[in-house]
Amino acid sequence: SHRYVNENGNCPSCIAISTELDGPRQILATDNFIAFCPWASIYPYEFAIYPKKHSTTLTKISQKEIFDLAMILRSTLGGMSQVLNNPSFNLIFQLSPEKKNSRQFHWHIEIYPHINDLTGLEKGFGVFVNSILPETAALKLGAAARKEIAKIVGVE
């Protein structure tokens, strides 16, 4: 990513965000964050939450951004629970591994619901089969997440 940023002037995550904004894989967006299912999802219903503007660290976000992050996390996780019948999941904060935050790094959160057991292909060969298109997952998760927001703000 260092070379890419130096050659192109922006990070791959910023390009992905601009591509996904209002696209078929977007689940939900707030003023400051976007949740979407990656176009090459390995796992069914996996999704990520990114700050819309390039940001290298979670620790320097504003109060408004904290509120937006809480809102998008609560609504997408609540929507996922509704769609997938309360699955267990991994929630991973991808933060810069360097002591000095690299200007190339764009922090984000990845969510991996546990809905399938790994089969022989996954275990034996490292070949993952995702039976749910990311566009289909985003459509279902987005509808459920919007219902969650309506409940949160009292507009059922």
Labelled PLM ranges:
Residues S1-E156:
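HIT superfamily nucleotide-processing domains
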